[in-house]
Amino acid sequence: MYVHGFASSANSGTVTRIRTMLPSAIVVADDIPVDPHEGLAMLRSMVEREQPDLIIGTSMGGMYTEQLHGFDRILVNPALRIADTMGAHGMVGKQTFQNPRKDGVQEFIVTKAMVKEYRDVQEQCFADTSEAEQEHVWGLFGDEDPLVHTYPLFSEHYRHAIWFHGEHRMNDDIFLNSVIPVIRWIDDRQNKKERQVVFISIDALRDKNGGQQPSARKAFRQLLETYNLFIVAPSPNYSGDGCADVQSWLKDVISVPAYDHIIFANQPQLLLGDFLIQPSAVNPHGSFMGTVLELGSDTFKTWDDIMEYFPRLNGH
């Protein structure tokens, strides 16, 4: 189920995008009434009727989605303080719908009284942040969003708060590389699906100068479709700066898929998984119980060689 943003409709490009990129999914969406109390009531009725596996809300829709308790939800750049956003960005007075609506209405008026109504509705956010809800709610926040800045507020109440590279509006890159990974995590949990685990050394992704190894990000994204990936980095014994550097680099290069998938370990051979990808120059501390793929070796000179290996395992 998709919940659209301010001055939008169920006919938005995001609905088309979700249907195109997730062709097996049944996507439901509806035009939200301009009156916020009517809008919230309509959405609550809709979730009871549709019983969606997942709700995705963007911007103002993220504010509404937060209040649809009991369902798995992804809030993308949620305007959790929509009344403040409206006042700060000229969303008061005569407005034009950005997408066609079923009733054919093209314009609407936002009055000061209506802004107050939105403020009343936004104050209902965070009414239930119980342990059960913690696992239902994910927040994704664009690091270049010029309109909404609610990461601090969201993270005061929920633990799954994640930055992604992007601005306020959804596009193909944001949906593919930031939203779909979270959808995959939620879907795996709902279906109790256990993927094979691949540990990847940070030094297999990052070169000595701090840049990306050739084709590393492309390979990571391709592997992510099939495997549960974890990045392994050395754990500094006397300083936490090294951990912060790794987290910063992964946030910049890998982004959302690195969230909660970083392991700091000086004895990676003790990790329990199916595959370990590491540079061939690494001195082994012992025998990893799974399969070790050594990047830079005669067998796997490049990431492209590694990417030829995995499809063969599945008979492709």
PLM features: residue spans?
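C-terminal cap/substrate-recognition subdomain and adjoining C-terminal extension
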Residues: G240-H316
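Gly/Ala-rich beta-loop-alpha elbow adjacent to hydrolase catalytic centers
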Residues: I56-E66
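The alpha/beta-hydrolase serine catalytic core
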Residues: D72-I186
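Asp-based phosphoryl-transfer active-site loop
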Residues: K192-Q212
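Short, hydrophobic beta-strand segments that form beta-sheet elements in well-ordered domains
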Residues: D53-G57, R73-L75, V137-D143, I262-F264, ...
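Non-catalytic pre-domain segments flanking phosphatase-related domains
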Residues: R184-F199, H316
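Short, acidic loop-to-helix structural element flanking the phosphoryl-transfer center
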Residues: D207-I231
